[in-house]
A protein has these predicted regions:
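A generic fold-level signal
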Residues: 39, 135-138
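Predominantly a Rossmann-like dinucleotide-binding segment in NAD(P)-dependent oxidoreductases
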Residues: 1-128, 255
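C-terminal helical cap and adjacent loop that interface with cofactors, partners, or active-site loops
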Residues: 137-267
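Eukaryote-specific, low-hydrophobicity, charge-rich regions
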Residues: 125-135, 149
Length: 267
């Protein structure tokens, strides 16, 4: 059948949001980029690829609603290391960086052992209270995308999930397809028929970004050495996903106004 519309979600994970988009390198849109671009330009790329049409317009809504000074617990301090409320706070830096080890590589010198993590964390930017940082990027954003033949997609990005995962639901003329990227399978639900499962090669989940880092570099290496490189796209298609993200942010900042995606003037 034909795809009619898609619902997709980027569930950032509360601890990933705190590390990367509140305390860390992508917290401030002036110093880095809007979060929809930093986190979701590849989601835009996937939606564009699945629908197979140019995106013509975007409407987007979202804000920084929670990680703000007015939401800081009474009696809390600038740093988690000496905060009397730290034990009851889910964003306690000492708890997060000793439970989820990989983000500690941003500040830890030497081996990622607990004593090294706690030593280098104390009074560092990553020890800051999540309600008292200089962050300005959103903690949630929903975007509606219209494609040239009338197909639509809705994409939601949110900080408020327990884990990091993406999920998607594709509505077609003959079936629905539902999947969670980290589960390595899709469920196909034929309209009027019996649902069945399609397993996805588990190798795709190996390495950074669920294998994306490795396979992107492999395709570049293949292209440079004259080998087949099925994953390479033309620049105009690759740029379109970034334009979609920029348009989403422009729409959000203007209260959800319609933004038209144009690669060139006059389109």
């Amino acid at each position: 059948g034909e795809i009619v519309n898609i619902h997709a979600s980027e569930n950032v994970g509360y601890y990933h949001q705190a590390h990367s988009y509140v305390r860390g390198p992508w917290r401030n849109s002036v110093e880095s980029s809007p979060m929809i671009l930093a986190k979701c330009c590849h989601d835009m790329d996937i939606l564009r690829y699945l629908i197979g049409e140019k995106c013509v317009s975007v409407n987007s809504y979202g804000s920084l609603s929670y990680f703000r000074k007015e939401n800081a617990p009474e009696g809390s301090t600038q740093f988690c290391s000496d905060c009397p409320r730290s034990e009851e706070c889910i964003y306690n830096a000492q708890k997060l960086y000793t439970r989820y080890i990989w983000p500690a590589g941003y500040f830890t010198k030497g081996e990622l052992a607990e004593q090294n993590i706690l030593r280098d964390l104390k009074y560092s930017p990553y020890d800051r209270c999540v309600y008292r940082c200089d962050n300005d990027v959103v903690d949630h954003q929903s975007t509606v995308l219209l494609f040239e033949k009338g197909k639509t997609a809705v994409h939601t990005m949110t900080a408020f999930s327990g884990e990091i995962y993406r999920d998607i639901k594709i509505y077609g003329t003959k079936a629905e397809i539902v999947g969670v990227m980290e589960d390595n399978f899709l469920e196909v639900r034929p309209l009027g028929g019996k649902a069945y499962r399609v397993d996805v090669n588990s190798e795709a989940s190996v390495g950074g970004h669920c294998g994306g880092d490795y396979y992107m570099m492999l395709q570049i290496w293949n292209a440079m050495n004259g080998r087949p490189c099925e994953g390479i796209t033309y620049l105009d298609v690759s740029l379109e996903s970034h334009l979609m993200a920029f348009c989403a942010e422009k729409s959000r900042l203007s209260g959800g106004s319609t933004q038209f995606v144009r690669l060139r003037e006059g389109e």
